[in-house]
């Protein structure tokens, strides 16, 4: 009897449980059908690595070598072109997919906003061109384009020509120079001139030395109390940032005082006054001038952009040409033919620059293989859906241009320097249109100084091949962290051409 009673109780309990399960399942299915029950977002696959550190150390180790590609290659092979990792203190979705990169660049200010590691944000300043958003960024971008986006201006082209020649005149007829250092002198002095109209001298050289320390801190890890420890890379960078900002602030205050003394000028006369540099553009901007701190951050960030990126490209282009004799020979022939047509010792003009067709192929290929801008950081403002995955709102995203540029599916022998691949008239247009070639970014944040950078590199290569022959003084190699550069600054032995 007891057994029979127990069996009945068990049967009743099982029936009750079954009813509860059925009711619960029906309720859950109904909620899901009505949209009231949301599935957890399906993130792109990947690994977040070690606690707190994530995969940051692996990424840094890879990018401090001449061949950083395995870091992304291995993850793309395992997870696909969009994968999840954890770097620089937070979970990050990496994209090596040109279609997703195109989406991110076009969605700036809507689905995504720019977002960089805290070390960069602190060192550049919140009001810098790289970090401002919305209407503020649009205004600064427009001003930068006005000042730096017109390299065809005869005075600007003449200044670039003169600055390159002045630098090379200090080279001995037979000497060893560290090319990256010399290229940085050119780009830094050019940018300072465009920003504050100060010619090369002790002030600019002192400023440049501090800039070197500032840039070294960009991708350092700002661990707690690092700012209080001056012996750390980040601590030194913060100290140099204060010095650079202070030097720029003095110049800006002096200009503001001078404008105050000239306040009697009519509004019409003021509008016709030539804006000699970027500070003048900022002080006379439509809609009112900028605050002192806005101008300091803005000028500081433009110095970083003009100083570092173009000088590295100049150096790497020479390295690639030295290692590719056929390309160097064709480049020399192009510039010798141009010089023979216009005559020696004649200043370069815009028509000369436009005739340097193979030079542009060399620049394109240098940008593709070893661009200093390997990609851009963004942060999702809303959930982003792509190929069945969901990148949730607030997630950090890195669009890797380098991964696309060096993908054999997009470029034949992608990791070989081959400037002839750009000789097709439609190659550049097609690659840019498909977002396979994005050395200057894209969308609303397309680099406003990209044409100026091309002009500076072209003028530099022209005078180098026409005045000197050279060879590598010692073996040097590329590394890619914190930015692309040659490990030793690429020293070369020069011989002046007769």
UniProtKB/Swiss-Prot annotation:
Positions of heme binding: 447
Catalysed reactions, semicolon-separated: (22S)-22-hydroxycampesterol + reduced [NADPH--hemoprotein reductase] + O2 = (22S)-22-hydroxycampest-4-en-3-one + oxidized [NADPH--hemoprotein reductase] + 2 H2O + H(+); 6-deoxoteasterone + reduced [NADPH--hemoprotein reductase] + O2 = 3-dehydro-6-deoxoteasterone + oxidized [NADPH--hemoprotein reductase] + 2 H2O + H(+)
GO molecular function: heme binding; iron ion binding; monooxygenase activity; oxidoreductase activity, acting on paired donors, with incorporation or reduction of molecular oxygen
Membrane topology: Single-pass membrane protein
Keywords assigned: Heme, Iron, Membrane, Metal-binding, Monooxygenase, Oxidoreductase, Transmembrane, Transmembrane helix
InterPro entries with a match to the protein in the record: Cyt_P450 (IPR001128), Cyt_P450_CS (IPR017972), Cyt_P450_E_grp-I (IPR002401), Cyt_P450_sf (IPR036396)
Gene Ontology biological-process entries: anther wall tapetum cell differentiation; brassinosteroid biosynthetic process; brassinosteroid homeostasis; pollen exine formation; positive regulation of flower development; response to UV-B
Cited CDD domains: CYP90-like
E.C. number(s) listed in UniProt: 1.14.19.79
Residues covered by region (Disordered): 257-277
Cellular component annotations (GO), alphabetically ordered: membrane
SUPFAM superfamilies: Cytochrome P450 (SSF48264)
Residue stretches spanning the membrane: 5-25
A Pfam family assignment: p450
Enzyme class: oxidoreductase
Highest taxon above the source species: Eukaryota
Cofactor: heme
Keyword Chloroplast: no
Pathway this chain belongs to: Plant hormone biosynthesis; brassinosteroid biosynthesis
Subcellular locations according to the entry: Membrane
Similarity section: Belongs to the cytochrome P450 family.
Function: Involved in reduction steps of the biosynthesis of plant campesterol-derivative steroids, ending to castasterone (CS) but missing brassinolide (BL). Catalyzes the conversion of (22S)-22-hydroxycampesterol (22-hydroxyCR, 22-OHCR) to (22S,24R)-22-hydroxyergost-4-en-3-one (22-hydroxy-campesta-4-en-3-one, 22-OH-4-en-3-one) and of 6-deoxoteasterone (6-deoxoTE) to 3-dehydro-6-deoxoteasterone (6-deoxo3DT, 6-deoxo3DHT).
Annotated protein name in UniProt: 3beta,22alpha-dihydroxysteroid 3-dehydrogenase
